[in-house]
Amino acid sequence: MGHKVNPVGLRLGINRTWDSRWFAGADYASLLHDDLKLREHLLGRLSGAGVSKVLIERPAKKPRVTIYAARPGVVIGKKGQDIEVLKKELSSMAKADVSLNIVEIRKPEIDAALVAQNIAQQLERRVAFRRAMKRAVQSAMRLGAQGIRINCSGRLGGAEIARMEWYREGRVPLHTLRADIDFGVATAKTTYGTCGVKVWIFKGEIMAHDPMAQDRRAAEQAPQR
C-alpha cells in the first residue's frame, strides 16, 4: 500500500500535518476554493523563487500565508517592494487583510518539491534525463539525505513510446509510517509532450508521535523573514 498512495497523505497526523490549517462551518467550500486560488497564484507568480510549499492559516478570519522558498530575495524584492505588492494582490483575492511570512529553505537539494521542479526544468531545457536524475541523487545524498528515489515518465529523450525510468540510492521505506519521507511532483512541458517527475526523499525516522515534527525541523533550519 505504501508504494501506491501519496506518502504525505499516508503520514498526516503521524509526523506530518496539513498545509491548510483552519476550521470552518457552512463556508468550508468557499474557503477551500480561496486556498486553491491563492496557492495557484503564488506558485505561478513566484516560479523563479523556488517555492516548495505554501502554508495557509486563518486565525480570527484573517488569513496568514507562509511561503517556503529557496530564494526569498526574489519574493521580497528590492527594499521589500515586491512583497508589499504581493500582499496587496493576496488581500484583494482573499477579500481580507492577509499577513505574509517568508521562510528560507537552506537546503533545497533535500527538498523533494524543489528537486522535482529542478529536474523538470532541466528536461524542458533538453538536458539528458539520466544526467539530471543522477546529479539530483548525488546532491541529495551529499547533503544528508538517507535515501532518495526519482521517477521520470513520458516521452523521455523524444522517444516514440512513452516509458518510466527511475533511479534510487539509499533507503526509502515507504511502508514505515514513522519514516520522515518528503514527496514532490512536477511536470515538464517539452516539445514532445509532458513528462512527469516524482521524488521521494528519506530524511530519517521520527520516533515520537508528533504531527508538527516536520514543521518544527524546518523552523529550526531557517529563521523567518
From Swiss-Prot:
Keyword field contains Ribosomal protein: yes
GO biological process, alphabetically ordered: translation
GO CC list: cytosolic small ribosomal subunit
Source taxon at top rank: Bacteria
Record key words, sorted: Ribonucleoprotein, Ribosomal protein, RNA-binding, rRNA-binding
Domain KH type-2: 38-106
InterPro entries reported in the protein's UniProt record: KH_dom (IPR004087), KH_dom-like_a/b (IPR015946), KH_dom_type_2 (IPR004044), KH_sf_prok-type (IPR009019), Ribosomal_S3_C_sf (IPR036419), Ribosomal_uS3_bac-typ (IPR005704), Ribosomal_uS3_C (IPR001351), Ribosomal_uS3_CS (IPR018280)
GO molecular function (one): mRNA binding
UniProt keyword Ribonucleoprotein, yes or no: yes
Family assignment from sequence similarity: Belongs to the universal ribosomal protein uS3 family.
Subunit architecture: Part of the 30S ribosomal subunit. Forms a tight complex with proteins S10 and S14.
Role description: Binds the lower part of the 30S subunit head. Binds mRNA in the 70S ribosome, positioning it for translation.
HAMAP family associated with the record: Ribosomal_uS3_B
Name of the protein: Small ribosomal subunit protein uS3
Encoding gene (name): rpsC
